[in-house]
């Protein structure tokens, strides 16, 4: 995989993590249980983050990609 693509994946990972972090902080500041939709978005982001991390790991030089 080209270095540019790896850089793009890393940038995407950073954006996903920032979005998830903001949702979690917002939920923590609320005085009640987060809405189901918020919990689902946090969970969906976690799954997407894991997928992007796996892709980055697979595509790093020396990983047999």
Language model features with spans:
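Short, charge/polar-rich alpha-helical segments
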Residues: 1-17
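A short, structured beta-strand/loop element
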Residues: 19-22
